[in-house]
Amino acid sequence: MKPNEFLICLDAGHGGMRNGTGPEKYVTYPSKCIQHRTGRFHSYGWFFEGVFNRSLANYLQQYLLDYGFQVKKIYEPINDTTLIKRCQLATSYAKAAQHSILVSIHGNAASPTARGWEIFTSPGETKSDLLATCIGEQVITATPGWVHRPDYTDNDLDKEARFQMLTGVAMPAVLSENGFFTNYSDAGLMIDIKWQQTIAKAHAKGILDYAVQQGVEWQ
């Protein structure tokens, strides 16, 4: 199987920005955002998760295309496409591919002290577990000293959840949470373009590792 016969359906959660920079221009406002007391972030201390998700996903798309993979975005640049619609798009694209996966990019939110990276699959043992492990191992290698939040209770590093993006498609699917934007230190990393590129490259390398194990020819 050639890389261009392997399809990645790429998802970025939540909405983007309409023309402007204020919070009222953020499609998902007042959800999926926070205003930190200091620092500029996206605008006057505001961090907008959907904007971050799109930036990281765009870098990931380019690295995957550089490997020769097919990539189909299932999100819009600005609008917050419904979960059902995004799953339907992924399913439609997958029908024409020899092999397909779904990767959903997110930032996390919790208490101000929560930090780090984690990745989710649907419950049970599936190929999604291997995909999550391949990506997770690359992210952990690429970010020494950062907080990693694996769950090895079932002998792999992913966590399990019944998120729509994971259960609404038949293909292997993972959802990565790339830092807590509610934590000031994590948000400072997440807004940095070089850090986004590092995380995106790690995702791409992990996807390549998985694809090779599924029969993709790579030198």
Regions found by a protein language model. Give the residues of each.
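Active-site-proximal helix/loop segments of hydrolytic enzymes
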Residues: 2-7, 44-219
